[in-house]
Amino acid sequence: MASQLALKSRIASTGSLEKIFNAQEMIAASHIAQARQLALDSKPYTDAIFDAVQTLVSHTHISHPIVKKDEGNPRVAVLALTADRGMAGAYTSSIIRETEDLLARLEGEGKQPQLYVYGRRGVSYYHYRNRPLAQSWEGDTEKPGVEVANAISRALLKAYMEPVDEGGVAELYIVYTEFINMVVQKVRVLRMLPVEVVKEDKSHLNVPDTTTAPQVRPLYSFEPSLDEVLDTVLPRYVRSRIHECLFEAAASEVACRQNAMHTATENARDLINDLTRKLNASRQASITQELTEIIGSADALNKKEE
């Protein structure tokens, strides 16, 4: 009897968890479409800004913080985009693991990383381990707004533009999760500043190799001056990059949560079915034992009367 009561209790508690998991899955499913659309909508503007920066970097000989910054400065800034809530599988742990690998690699190169974290789970992780944070932000990781993107970009840009003797950094890195599709989300490390020239890969276009031929590049005119143009482009580039990464991370978080809750719901249902079979088997065994005892008692009485 005690075993049956324990099984009934486990079935009831597992059923409650199954309802919670299923509700979380449905909530995530209702958010994923908007999160995906925001991530897609941010790409055209970010790509346009990035193309403009690439054009400036590759077609001009410039000495500006956007491409070169304090080469002797060992300090670098690392921004990790984590989640506010759990129930998202290995989402935050994957970000933290990649961040730790990046920090170890940078320290191995003789650099001094300064860590910035967005998301309550990541902030709690580092606070619990008494790890210093240069700055942190919490709230709305599933639906990041313009305000948080502006706050993060201002803090990172301020750290990047400060002189060496005032604690400025020489590089900016972002660790985030790129949304590929509902099943695949990949953790990425992006060096945002200084900007690196990305060479276009034309191997898939089946065009002849013209690298040995003289290349005619467009003539650009900058008004009022090149430095003023770059000073205007730099904060917009940083803000757009961070905004895009926030949207990618939000879509990835929601997708991970939906997948994790779907798996948890299925596991809870399987466990309920298994426990129900055990309960039925226990009931059957109990009934069989009672019938055996009744039949045995009846046989004993019959023999006694004879």
Swiss-Prot record:
It is found in: Cell membrane. GO terms for biological process: proton motive force-driven plasma membrane ATP synthesis. It comes from the Bacteria. The keyword Metal-binding does not apply. One of its GO terms (cellular component) is plasma membrane. It is a peripheral membrane protein. The keyword Thylakoid does not apply. Its main location: membrane. HAMAP family: ATP_synth_gamma_bact (MF_00815). Produces ATP from ADP in the presence of a proton gradient across the membrane. The gamma chain is believed to be important in regulating ATPase activity and the flow of protons through the CF(0) complex. This is ATP synthase gamma chain. The lineage of its organism: Bacteria, Bacillati, Actinomycetota, Actinomycetes, Bifidobacteriales. The gene is atpG.
